[in-house]
């Protein structure tokens, strides 16, 4: 019979996704067949599986940590906000519909038996499932129809460990408040608490641990030290802490336009881990500066984000930068914005029927009802073999003054040839639909060399850090960190359904 443990949090960005990934790697290293599961994920960071199914990126990196291929069953429901009131609802990798919050709140009850069936299919194939909640279980205005926190725990009778982020402050209030806002049955499901991102001497924390255990009658089974692990961040909350000031000591300054509806910002994790590369996220012209490369990322609402560029003054800043021989790369929605105009006759993305683009590429995009979700391999215009994935609802046509960026050779593992993207005559403006393009070592190394030689400097002096190898190392570090700082004997008892009591054992931080 499958063992299960559910990680819920006192708030968004408490560390749930990373904790689940670490536990998956820890159990994998013990020889267990383990998979992650999150019934419903709201995120604009998504991935396309080998079968063309769309799922949340968090469950992808958790699957990697577990040593298994991403499977859409690990995240059956994906919500992709299109604006502040509406989301695209994706079930088992395919679009169901666009729904406002009230409509979806009523609709999601119909998904419960389907979610249960999906979960059971994973349970039949594995030894352990590590479930992840969303936000906080104490969203009392939504709990009557919850399918991702206590509602999910109840569906499969999973024990819950609550994780709280001490780095933001107010950790004991968040633990107590979360638990006390739950009803009696839900409180009983919380079997342990983990305090995350702790800095300092745990002896100073111990009086608080003793008091919170007495107040809640729930044991604190771990205190995880703050660790500077270089893992993908999925929650858009993390963008608020991203750097916007260039590092004067770096060899290259890369500026990413932080669009209000930015999607798949995980595309840029690979840039952030390379030595001597400054990556910053800019929201206004005051922070624009004089970068060596500007990247316009993907967007869940390209037309509205194009309007943001216009209103913020960033449109003019990018155009002037390009006129002065600046290098600009657009990914997916960013590629669409680089063109002359975008047309939305069926109002797929917004109520605007047409909007002018940046005019840096001789292209036009029309938005279609059908979404393209594929994994691809191909060869770029300069001969680099690349792989990545596409997620878009637009079709872009090139004019005579552009050439294709990439020749696609295979789609979802099947031989299929077509052209992707566009390049300007002077080669400084590039647009592509390929997410993950920077994850290709040779392409990235050549890009860095080009940017540096353009500054009359020598080629990039470091070996490109391979993303897959890097992530494997980070997953192992994470697993070791958790094993050293969680009372694993207590956690395993919880997973077996055994009752554990508030302990007199004092946790000790181990780096």
UniProtKB/Swiss-Prot annotation:
The active site is at 332 (nucleophile), 435. It comes from the Bacteria. One of its GO terms (biological process) is cobalamin biosynthetic process. Keywords: Cobalamin biosynthesis, Glutamine amidotransferase. This is Cobyric acid synthase. The gene is cobQ. Catalyzes amidations at positions B, D, E, and G on adenosylcobyrinic A,C-diamide. NH(2) groups are provided by glutamine, and one molecule of ATP is hydrogenolyzed for each amidation. One of its GO terms (molecular function) is catalytic activity.
